[in-house]
């Protein structure tokens, strides 16, 4: 029972929409997204990667980093507040992930 191309495309688009609207939830997992879409996590990861060249987890991280960079540029919020507002539970881990993504610390980026 193979899913149609249209069905796989819709799953990928819905996955992107969920990530783009729920990225700020620290407990958002790819398993949660797969459950919301009524598909297996492994299947979701495979088809998402086919369509976007990145895993859902990588896309979630990218969305979080881009939103964090916007907040760093446009607000005076503390790095800690920004970390929490883009879905990180640990501001130190956020700073490390941000530096890996942008090759700059959040404070240097600002």
Describe each region flagged by the PLM:
Residues 1-17, 35-37, 50-58, 62:
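Short, Lys/Arg-enriched, Trp-marked, Pro/Gly-tolerant hinge/linker segments that flank
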Residues 8-12, 30, 79:
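The cytosolic transmitter module of two-component sensor histidine kinases
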Residues 17, 21, 50-92:
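Terminal helix-turn-helix DNA-binding modules in bacterial transcription factors
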Residues 22-27, 55-56, 105-106:
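Short helix/strand-capping hinge loops at secondary-structure junctions
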Residues 36-37, 86-87, 98:
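Core residues of bacterial helix-turn-helix
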Residues 43-44, 48, 93-94, 98:
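Short hydrophobic/aromatic patch on the recognition helix
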Residues 96-110:
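…primarily DNA-binding HTH/wHTH and HhH modules…
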């Amino acid at each position: 029972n193979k899913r149609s191309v249209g069905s796989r495309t819709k799953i990928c688009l819905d996955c992107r929409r969920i990530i783009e609207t729920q990225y700020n939830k620290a407990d958002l997992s790819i398993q949660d997204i797969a459950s919301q879409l009524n598909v297996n996590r492994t299947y979701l990861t495979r088809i998402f990667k086919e369509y976007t060249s990145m895993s859902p987890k990588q896309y979630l991280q990218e969305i979080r980093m881009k939103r964090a960079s916007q907040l760093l540029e446009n607000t005076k919020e503390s790095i800690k507040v920004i970390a929490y507002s883009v879905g990180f539970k640990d501001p130190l881990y956020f700073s490390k992930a941000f530096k890996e993504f942008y090759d700059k610390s959040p404070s240097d980026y600002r």
